[in-house]
Curated annotation (Swiss-Prot):
GO cellular component: cyclin-dependent protein kinase holoenzyme complex; nucleus
Region (Disordered): 404-519, 585-753
Binding site for ATP: 62-70, 85
The protein's role, per its UniProt record: Serine/threonine-protein kinase involved in transcription regulation. Phosphorylates the UBC2/RAD6 ubiquitin-conjugating enzyme (E2), leading to monoubiquitination of histone H2B and the silencing of telomeric-associated genes. Also required for histone H3 methylation. Necessary for the recovery from pheromone-induced growth arrest in the cell cycle G1 phase.
Taxonomic classification: Eukaryota, Fungi, Dikarya, Ascomycota, Saccharomycotina
Annotated family: Belongs to the protein kinase superfamily. CMGC Ser/Thr protein kinase family. CDC2/CDKX subfamily.
Name of this protein: Serine/threonine-protein kinase BUR1
Catalytic residues of the enzyme: 201
Biased composition (Pro residues): 491-502, 619-636
Composition bias type Basic and acidic residues, residue spans: 605-614, 744-753
């Protein structure tokens, strides 16, 4: 049998196929990794990526990335423009760059409107293999045989980046535009930091802008994850950990001071420093900290923000480059940017460019800075001229500016009307865009004779209403468009929009409105409360409420608030404790009992009874005495008489005998003796006897059941008013088995529940 089984196993293995040749295990010299070199096939295919040929086409180079070039391309199937980031693999044995692997992995894990999106990856076959497919002859294919392999990261095409926008002379940014851009940058970097990543290359060239005015943070070639807690309103991400990273990151002009001093235990605050540099670059249109070397970069930083003291930055003395902190520079950022920013703007700039990374603002705290809530408020949507502005266009902008300066017409004589109007327009624009740094010069009372030419007097606008056009003017206007016709001002303007009403709904900072609050409508039930469509609880389709399992009235509260298992639906849906087998494997052995834990309102002196309050029964009003025919009361208790022992000697023997008989009756009774100090003496023939009157009927039938029980009721198990089973009942739990109990067809179904 064993030989037959082994033969079957060998036959089965042969049918699957045997490995004829095992490739040798090789070892990479640089990385020390072991790998297997597989033989190439003619139909080579890289799985997980798209083939470049036949799907995409390069058009124009846009810029240079960290480890590759960026091109503008076209997706041939949809004719949509895309940005193609080329990742170069130089030789056949070269590994895929680790920075590109990080960038692809991080972009796949990010999804935010202010972070660039990775569409797909594309693999370009080397032209040496597919020269004919590229439309090349053999000579062209052999000439380009040594070209490098390349992967492409396909990204959405952006019309501009921030460096091109700032250097474009035809684009002017207002303060509302700058605030909008800053908020978008802070939202994007806050999302990246909360996802436990550091960008480590924040600069204007890596902040892109699409045609809708949405900024997107790009170029994650130097990004990586960090260790520690994510940022909050006070501390940056990764604070308080011993993790060490490389300090040679970030472009030099945007490098934080802790990186300049050689700190390897940095946090997400290095990205906030770059955002502060970008914020200041909005106003000077050029990088604000242009150091020539790494040491010079530290001097440039301290010249702007001042040399840090021990109180400003306590840990600076322990960094490798602490010699730079021995300089003595005073901060000059207020003199440099005070002409552009208000006090709140300067405060935001100084906290973004704080030398101590732990005193630097986090992104979520910077978004709540009061600079963004003062006038002018940030624009809701960014609208810029539709012109492509990339980093590669900066040189072209400089050439255009030189050409325009050299080709300017000769200047007009001083005091000319055209020059005067142009200077007035420029001054008005300047005063609208920037706050006054000094008062404008006062106008002289006597005008200069050259300022008012005689040939072209200035016409003042007339205050008369516009006249009706003549027939000649109407005939002229009907022939064609009148180029220099001015539209008269409208006689009636549209009404101004009403301001938002005060209150917390429209203005959160408004004082509270101390008005009486209207109480909520009492829920009277479905047949009393209605909406516009009919039933209060449903929509217009009808009585769906009456067929649902549970409606809006559920879950309701427990009446006495003492049942821990009460779930609001009138039944105990789960008598056992829920547990997660994957997380707590031992919970199945730690089940709590089904018996509920009684609350504070439960009185356990008698079982299965709930007491509302501890009070004696109140008598019925005379008009509400229950009808004995409808509500038969139990048999009245016999009157119990007690002997007054102080007066036995002064009575007759008959009275003594009667009292003795009554005393024996009392002694044989099973009920406790109750004396009443307020009982009146009975002056009958039998002597002075204290008569015990029965208690008055109680008002609440439920309390009558609880307090007014006799011996028969209290002797039943559980203290129930009615016994669960009697010999006469059909279920006969406490009696001998009968035909009804043995026959399952005659058994009451209620007994099982």
């Amino acid at each position: 049998m064993s030989q037959e089984g082994s033969a079957k196993r060998a036959d089965f293995k042969y049918k699957i196929g045997k490995i004829k040749h095992t490739p040798p295990v090789l070892k990479d010299v640089r990385s020390g990794l072991e790998f297997i070199e597989l033989e190439k096939r003619d139909d080579e295919k890289v799985y997980g990526v798209t083939k470049f040929l036949g799907n995409y086409k390069e058009e124009k180079k846009l810029g240079q990335g960290t480890f590759g070039e960026v091109y503008r391309g076209v997706h041939l199937a949809t004719q949509r423009q895309v940005a193609m980031k080329k990742i170069l693999v130089k030789t056949e044995n070269d590994l895929f760059p680790i920075t590109a692997q990080r960038e692809i992995t991080i972009l796949k894990r990010l999804n935010h409107r202010n972070v660039v999106q990775l569409i797909e990856m594309v693999y370009d076959y080397p032209p040496a293999q597919n020269g004919a497919a590229y439309g090349q002859d053999s000579s062209q294919a052999s000439a380009s045989a040594d070209t490098m392999k390349s992967f492409y990261m396909i990204l959405p095409y952006m019309v501009a980046d921030l460096s091109g926008i700032l250097h474009n002379p035809r684009v002017t940014l207002e303060m509302a535009d700058i605030k909008n851009m800053m908020l978008q940058i802070l939202e994007g970097i806050n999302y990246i930091h909360c996802k436990k990543f550091m960008h480590r290359d924040i600069k204007t060239a890596n902040i892109l802008l699409d045609h809708k005015g949405i900024l997107k943070i790009a170029d994650f070639g130097l990004a990586r994850n960090y260790y520690g807690a994510p940022p909050n309103l006070k501390y940056p991400g990764g604070a308080g950990t011993d993790a060490k990273y490389t300090s040679v990151v970030v472009t030099r002009w945007y490098r934080a001071p802790e990186l300049v001093l050689g700190d390897k235990n940095y946090t997400t605050a290095v990205d906030i420093w770059g955002i502060g540099c970008v914020f200041a670059e909005f106003f000077e249109k050029r990088p604000i900290l242009q150091g020539k070397t790494d040491i010079d970069q530290g001097h440039v930083i301290f010249k702007l923000m001042g040399t840090p003291s021990d109180s400003d930055w306590q840990l600076a003395r322990y960094l490798p480059g602490a010699e730079l902190t021995r300089t003595s520079y005073e901060p000059t950022y207020k003199e440099r940017f005070g002409k552009y920013l208000t006090e709140k703007g300067l405060d935001l700039l100084s906290t973004l460019l704080s030398l101590d990374p732990y005193k630097r603002l986090t992104a979520m705290a910077a978004m709540q800075h009061p600079f963004f809530s003062e006038d002018p408020l940030p624009k809701l949507q960014l609208t810029l001229p539709c012109e492509e502005s990339h980093e590669t266009d900066i040189a072209r902008y400089g050439q255009e500016m030189q050409k325009t300066v050299s080709n300017l017409p000769p200047a007009a004589p001083s005091g000319h009307a055209v020059e005067q109007s142009q200077t007035q327009q420029q001054s008005s624009r300047h005063h609208q865009s920037q706050p006054y740094q000094s008062l404008p010069p006062q106008k002289s009372s006597q005008p200069h004779p050259q300022q008012i030419p005689e040939a072209a007097p200035v016409q003042q606008p007339s205050q008369q209403p516009p006249q009706e056009p003549s027939a000649h003017q109407q005939q002229y206007s009907s022939r064609g468009p009148q180029q220099h016709r001015t539209t008269p001002a409208p006689t009636s303007l549209p009404p101004k929009p009403k301001p938002a009403p005060p209150g917390a709904r429209y203005n959160r900072e408004a004082p509270p409105q101390n008005k009486p609050v209207k109480p909520l409508t009492r829920h009277l039930g479905a047949q009393y409360q209605h909406n516009n469509y009919g039933n209060y609880y449903n929509h217009w389709q009808g009585g769906e409420r009456y067929y649902e399992t549970y409606n809006d009235g559920y879950p309701h509260a427990d009446r006495y608030s003492d049942d821990t298992h009460y779930n609001g639906y009138g039944y105990r849906s789960r008598g056992y404790q829920r547990y997660d087998m994957r997380r707590e494997g031992e919970s199945r052995y730690n089940q709590r009992p089904y018996a509920p834990q009684q609350g504070a309102a439960y009185r356990p002196n008698r079982r299965d009874t709930y007491k509302l309050v501890d009070r004696t029964g109140q008598p019925y009003p005379p008009e509400r005495v229950p009808n004995p025919e409808l509500h038969p009361s139990p048999a009245p208790r016999p009157k119990r008489t007690l002997t007054n022992t102080t007066q036995l000697s002064s009575h007759s023997s008959a009275a003594t005998g009667s009292t003795a008989a009554s005393g024996s009756a009392v002694s044989n009774s099973s009920e406790p003796v109750r004396r009443s100090s307020t009982a009146s003496l009975d002056n009958s023939e039998s002597g002075n006897i204290l008569q015990q009157k029965p208690p008055p009927p109680v008002a609440n039938p439920l309390e009558a059941r609880i307090y007014g029980r006799d011996e028969v009721q209290s002797n039943h198990p559980g203290g129930r008013l009615y016994p669960r089973s009697t010999p006469d009942s059909k279920n006969s739990e406490g009696a001998a088995p009968s035909e009804a109990s043995t026959d399952p067809t005659k058994r009451n179904i209620v007994d099982y529940y």
